[in-house]
UniProtKB/Swiss-Prot annotation:
GO terms for molecular function: large ribosomal subunit rRNA binding; structural constituent of ribosome. GO terms for biological process: translation. It comes from Stenotrophomonas maltophilia (strain K279a). InterPro entries: Ribosomal_uL14, Ribosomal_uL14_bac-type, Ribosomal_uL14_CS, Ribosomal_uL14_sf. This is Large ribosomal subunit protein uL14. Binds to 23S rRNA. Forms part of two intersubunit bridges in the 70S ribosome. Keywords: Ribonucleoprotein, Ribosomal protein, RNA-binding, rRNA-binding.
Length: 122
């Protein structure tokens, strides 16, 4: 469950290490984002010579949360931290690699690229 001011790790090689959510997209009063939701983030920590710089604003899709996601069979998939993948203006991933596992809930038309790049799909 991600809300405004939440810090997330970045699960791609775009050059950002940590981002902060400042808006949950999808409704004017929407408060929380879960796995598969798009949020607006600002880069708080970046590596030198990366594709993104500190202070820049991007869209991102949430790929892992501490809260987890409940499946139809009743199982719950949780992670040790919150993570996101940065997106460009066309909603495509900026990085060319994805680090760590992602969930099957991302397998929509929009995020098949992220699922195919991920080393493990849970």
């Amino acid at each position: 469950m991600i809300q405004m001011q939440s810090y997330l790790d970045v699960a791609d090689n775009s050059g950002a290490k940590q981002v902060m959510c400042f808006k949950v997209l999808g409704g004017s009063k929407r408060r929380y984002a879960g796995i598969g939701d798009i949020i607006k983030v600002t880069v708080k920590d970046a590596i030198p010579r990366g594709k993104v710089k500190k202070g820049e604003v991007y869209d991102a899709v949430v790929v892992r949360t501490r809260k987890g996601v409940r499946r139809a069979d009743g199982s719950l998939i949780r992670f040790d931290g919150n993570a996101a993948v940065l997106l460009n203006s066309k909603q495509e991933p900026i990085g060319t690699r994805i680090f760590g596992p992602v969930t099957r809930e991302l397998r929509s038309e929009k995020f098949m690229k992220i699922v195919s790049l991920a080393p493990e799909v849970l």
